[in-house]
From Swiss-Prot:
Subcellular location: Secreted
GO process terms (BP): body fluid secretion
Signal sequence extent: 1-19
Name listed for the protein in its UniProt record: Venom protein 55.1
Keyword Flavoprotein: no
Length: 73
């Protein structure tokens, strides 16, 4: 949720910078003006963020009861 809020603020700043600095030689480029690549970066960052979470995708490491394995019949 926080990442989406940050992404929204960055896109808002990018759109504001285009309006105010259109006559400037060097503009602030935050990757949003490049079209599809900006969304690709956003998806990659969301994927990395979800992979780092404990309940995210990937192999689940289960703790098991060693006593139950030894005494299983």
């Amino acid at each position: 949720m926080n990442f989406l809020c940050i992404l929204f603020v960055v896109s808002l700043i990018s759109s504001l910078s285009k309006c105010t600095t259109s006559s400037m030689k060097r503009e602030l480029d935050l990757g949003m003006s490049r079209g599809h690549s900006g969304s690709q970066v956003g998806k990659a960052l969301l994927g990395i963020q979800s992979a780092n979470r404990t309940d995210g995708p990937g192999r689940k490491r289960r703790s098991f009861d060693l006593y139950a394995l030894v005494n299983a019949k």
